[in-house]
């Protein structure tokens, strides 16, 4: 992690050399306040002899152009325009041997400055700069005001009392906003190149103080530390916001927001392709999830006063806490119980062992996952929905065509498994009248009862010995029967076009009839 702007500076008189020299005051902890650079008064400057390489721009004076190199100092109480700064950081991060650079004192102004590698611009309290461009290896230490800084791989460290407005952070650039500092209208274009939620920490924007109206674009990242606050942030696709502190009124326009343990997010709006993730110990309040947006609340996470609009997705488990409203009214997930949850467009509810869900509505694109020992009652499954369960769960509900289904006491009946759905039959259990429409039926032993139907895209996976004393029917389209053995006095019937592929399976049935199609 880069550190060399985590330093405040002061000018002191060296009695041996008879010159002004720079003394740094290091802040060893990035979250702690550093010493404040001492602003020189005009009287102090004029009373101190300076070397030829050290220049002073007096109050009321304007200097245009020039280059600072080789530890030169420019002390600005007037106005400096168009300077190039190539000195001040030659010795690297937090090195007290660093001297030189541009000093903007109380009342001083610098415009259109270029800071190259190894260069440092220091803006003390009461000083102001505008339109500074900082390249890789260069930096700006800010205790005054800076407007329209561009970080092309360079760094801007905003100390207590400093205000940075309109900073643009490009690839490998870094803005650190310390406690007591403010950054407004920042544009972040870097920091997330390491992938979602990767804590790069040395690029993008790191907030210990306050960040207001930040725009996070593709590859951009804002990290809000435990003591930091971000207000009115907009995150676009490919960008993300990592919250350990406080985030207020964030809008996710395809971007991601991660709320970590101890972090809080209030008033987040999740639009199409946006994703808010609440991790264990994280808290979200008053989140609004619009169509194609997603709210994910992990085990131990909390989201309250959620507004889940039609087409929005909720991803959670009964180990989380989520309360709010959806298109059917109020819903809740708390204390191991879920009620009136709507799942669609990538939404998913995991019902854990010993936990309960009631009145669950699983619409197109939604998934209900009931673990062994979990219970779900009054379930509504619509076309395009997904059920994940095994015979150790307890489930009752209906499909949108009116068909009823149930799982309980090791017996399943009336299941229809569409694409993505998986039912696992455990040894010693049974399933009756199961229809597999592109989903998967996995049997670790057990018994197939009634008519088991495999339609196009269906998979029946056997492990061990499974008994079929009734009828296994394969209709239109292709299906796969793989592994294990199928025994008993039942029959296998292939009808309709398509191919039944039998792979590593032993069939011991009363009859195997190929009426139409192909058996391979």
Regions found by a protein language model. Name each.
Residues 42-520:
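Beta-strand-rich extracellular passenger or scaffold domains
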Residues 1-41, 45:
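Bacterial Sec-dependent N-terminal signal peptides
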